């Protein structure tokens, strides 16, 4: 797959390459075993996709971190007691591969989200088109981009949290590993902790393969109980990076307040 193109003033050959890359990602997601992904989400609260980005594409996206004009804000996690490390929120003028990845994932995540809502007896307010849903977020006062690029060095970590910014919420999100686990960095596993009904919490640690997305629960999910379906609250974070540098791309399907 081709490399990332510029945000503006893209040449015709580069624009054609970007279009081909987007088509490749869409085709890969269309060919993925979504029933198995849904089953794994039901079992663990997270599930990996096939490889969506080449190592070259991953490196190009990771390098965007050093272009501050692409971001609306930078968060120092230690300063806010969120952990250690940094992340940056993109502006709404998303780089094409970031926008394309989110748009390509939406139609596959939407049926799972609607199914979860039905199990929990909740409304499912999400339309077929992502753009229409984001317009509703903006009308409700959630109008800031929530797409993030994260950078961790040795000793950095991310405290358990939820990416919830208001009442407008999509129950699934994705994170894409941009560096090679075990080669570019060690440690830094993705953490998911689920509070189980009348039981101790369950934790899951998942390495992020380079170029793969991990789909996971945003706030809570349906879990089997003696009464049918119960709400399983979930938080996520990142374990301590032991060595190297870890970049990840976070894709959230609602905007921030």
What kind of feature is each model-predicted range?
Residues 1-43:
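Fe(II)/2-oxoglutarate
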Residues 36-134:
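Non-heme Fe(II)/2-oxoglutarate
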Residues 170, 181, 185-257:
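Catalytic core of Fe(II)/2-oxoglutarate
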Residues 151-153, 167-184:
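Short, conserved beta-strand element in jelly-roll/cupin
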Residues 54, 154, 243-244:
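Short strand-connecting beta-turns/loops that link adjacent beta-strands
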Residues 47, 142-154:
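A short glycine-rich, His/Asp/Glu-containing loop-to-beta-strand
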Residues 147-149, 174-176, 249-253:
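A structural signal for short, well-ordered beta-strand segments
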Residues 158-165:
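Histidine-centered catalytic micro-motifs
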